[in-house]
Amino acid sequence: GKDINNNMEKAACATSSLVTQDDLQYHSLSKQQNESPQPLVGTGKKSPESLVKPDATPLSSPRHVRIKNWGSGMTFQDTLHHKAKGILTCRSKSCLGSIMTPKSLTRGPRDKPTPPDELLPQAIEFVNLSLEISVQDQIPPVCNDCQYYGSFKEAKIEEHLA
């Protein structure tokens, strides 16, 4: 099946890995050689085509990029990278082409510590919310105990004796 991004679903048991620059180089080499895949390093004589510099830029993108949805565990073969307008930020071990980090959701490191007049109200709000949630979680059991024992005091005495 396909999803809304034209990703083609692959078997869930297939192993997934990040696309590496080495994968892209291998693909561009095999494409140059009329789609006949050949190993980059042979066991015999090494031809100039089989030697690839690690920092060489690939001439073309692979037809499919394997993408894993870590939430569902499903693996897809994505083709949207063919429509990319810019060069993807790829290294030999990872590709950041599909990671979305909008500036509105990211913050850089602060130049200086948060001033106390800004930090104190945030801390007070955090503590109040924490206490409010904690108390709300305890209200039903306390009410049940009060109804069972007839009073809050008896409920607390029974709790300590148990």
UniProtKB/Swiss-Prot annotation:
Q: What induces it?
A: By lipopolysaccharide (LPS).
Q: What does the UniProt record tell us about how this protein is modified after translation?
A: Polyubiquitinated; mediated by SPSB1, SPSB2 and SPSB4, leading to proteasomal degradation.
The UniProt GO MF terms for this protein read: calmodulin binding; metal ion binding; nitric-oxide synthase activity
Q: Does the keyword Chaperone apply?
A: no
Could you say which residues bind (6R)-L-erythro-5,6,7,8-tetrahydrobiopterin here? 98
Recorded superkingdom: Eukaryota
Subunit annotation: Homodimer. Interacts with NHERF1. Interacts with GAPDH; induced by oxidatively-modified low-densitity lipoprotein (LDL(ox)). Interacts with S100A8 and S100A9 to form the iNOS-S100A8/9 transnitrosylase complex. Interacts with SPSB1, SPSB2 and SPSB4. Interacts with ELOC and CUL5 in the presence of SPSB1 or SPSB2 or SPSB4. Forms a complex with ASL, ASS1 and HSP90AA1; the complex regulates cell-autonomous L-arginine synthesis and citrulline recycling while channeling extracellular L-arginine to nitric oxide synthesis pathway.
Q: How is its activity regulated?
A: Regulated by calcium/calmodulin.
Give the compositionally biased regions (Polar residues). 24-37
Q: Which family does it belong to?
A: Belongs to the NOS family.
Its name, as the record gives it, is: Nitric oxide synthase, inducible
Query: Record-annotated residues binding FAD?
Result: 160
Catalysed conversion reaction: 2 L-arginine + 3 NADPH + 4 O2 + H(+) = 2 L-citrulline + 2 nitric oxide + 3 NADP(+) + 4 H2O
Report one GO cellular component: cytosol
Compartment(s): Cytoplasm, Cytosol
Q: Which UniProt keywords apply?
A: Calcium, Calmodulin-binding, Cytoplasm, FAD, Flavoprotein, FMN, Heme, Iron, Metal-binding, NADP, Oxidoreductase, Ubl conjugation, Zinc
Residues that bind Zn(2+): 90, 95
Q: Where is this region: Disordered?
A: 24-65
In the Enzyme Commission scheme, what number(s) does this protein have?
A: 1.14.13.39
What PANTHER family does the annotation carry? NITRIC OXIDE SYNTHASE, NITRIC OXIDE SYNTHASE OXYGENASE
Q: Where does L-arginine bind?
A: 132
The cofactor required is: heme b; FAD; FMN; (6R)-L-erythro-5,6,7,8-tetrahydrobiopterin
